[in-house]
Amino acid sequence: NELFADVPEALSNTLEILDKVEYYSIDHAPIMPTFAIPEDFGTEEGYRQKYTEKDLFDEFTQDENGKVVLDEEAAKAKIKRLGGYEKLYRIKLEADYLAKLAFDGAKRIYGDPLSDEVKERLVFELYIMKTMGFPGYFLIVQDFINAARTQLGVSVGPGRGSAAGSAVAYCLGITKIDPIQYDLLFERFLNPDRISLPDIDVDFDDDGRGEVLRWVTEKYGQEKVAHIITYGTMATKLAIKDVARVQKLPLSESDRLAKLVPDKIPDKKLNLPNAIAYVPELQAAEASPDPLVRDTLKYAKMLEGNVRGTGVHACGTIICRDDITDWVPVSTADDKETGEKMLVTQYEGSVIEDTGLIKMDFLGLKTLSIIKEAVENVRLHRGLALDIDKISINDPATYKLYCDGRTIGTFQFESAGMQKYLRELQPGTFEDLIAMNALYRPGPMDYIPDFIDRKWGRKP
C-alpha cells in the first residue's frame, strides 16, 4: 500500500483482475488433422452403417490376434482417451486405409506373396498405431513426403532416429531403411506402455524445405498451419550487461563484471547468486561503494532467467484439424524461406504436446543439397540419371575412402575424431559404419578402441 499510495487503483485493479481469473486446463487428447481418404475406399458415414459400437469395442480392446487384453474398466478408459466412439469410427477408417497403403508398399518392396515375418511385423505395428489413435499421423507424413519426391523434386533423407525402426514407415516410403533386415526395434519409436505422440524427423534438402512447407500450408490451409515460438532467456552474463546498459554503467566495468562470472561452478548450478558466492571479486562488487555497481548485480539477479526475446523453432511445425486460433494463442512472423507471413504459436514446444496439437519436424539438411547438386552435375556432364536411393552400399571404392578417413562433407562422419577411428577400424561393410556411427557418441565412445580390437581379433 505504501509503494502504490499515489496510485491506489493499481492495487484495486490488480485484485479485480485476479478475481476474474478462472482456472482451466490446456491439456487435451491429440487433435489429429483430417487426412482426405478417397471416398471409393470408405467414409465415416459408411463405417457407422457397417460397424457397431460393439465391433469397435472389441477391435480396440483386443490384441492383433483377437485376444482380450483389457478388463472392462480399462477398456472404457482407453476408448474415452481416444475420443469416444464418435472418434473411433474415424480412427478405424484411417487405420484401414493405412493398412492398405502399407501392404501395397510391402508387396512392391518384398514381393508378393509376403513372408510370414513381414506380415506379422506389419500387423503388429499397424495394431499399435491404430489402438494408440495415430494412423492419421502416418497418412499425413507419407503424403507430404510423397509430394516432396514426386511433385516438388525435393530430396528427402532416408530416415532419422527411432522412426527408422518402423516397417510400416518403410513400406509407406517415409523411410528408406529396412528395419527387418537390420533388426531395428519398433518399440523405441512407438510403445503402448509409454503413451506419447509419434515424432518423425524428416530431412529435406535446404532449398526444398520451404517448398514442402508451402505445399503443406496450401493443402491444409493457412489458418491450420503454424510454426512454434521459442523463448530466449537472460543468461547470467547477459543479464549483467543488459542491466548495466540501462544503469549507464561504463562499458569497461560492465565487461569486467560479466567476465568475473565463471563458465561453470563445481557441483552447483551456474547462476548469479552461486557465482557471487563462488567468486570473491563478485562479492566485493556486490558490496561496492558505487551504487551503480551494486544495483547492477541486484537487478541482474532479479532478471536472470526471465524471457528476453522470442524466435521461431528451427524445424517444428503444427498442422491442426481446426483453425489454430481455436486452440492456442498465436502471433505472426515473416517466414525467411517463403517470404510470407506465418502463424506462430505462443506456446513453446515443451507445452505444445500437452495441448494435443500435432507437431511435425521439417528439417533442412545441407548434405542433401550437396548430394542433389552432385547428382545433377553427373546428369549434365556424364548424361547419367542417378537414383541416389538405388546406389549399391557395397562399393569397394567407397569403403576405401572411409578406410582412408576421407569423409569431409559426409554427414556424421566428417569430424577429425571420426576420421581417426575410421582409419583404425578399416570398415568393409555397411554394418561396420552403422556400429561406428552408434558408438561415436558421448556415452559409448570409450568403447571404440575395444570394438576395433575385437574386429581385428586383437581381443577376444
Residue ranges and their predicted role:
Residues 1-460:
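Alpha-helical scaffold/interaction cores of sigma-54-like transcription cofactors
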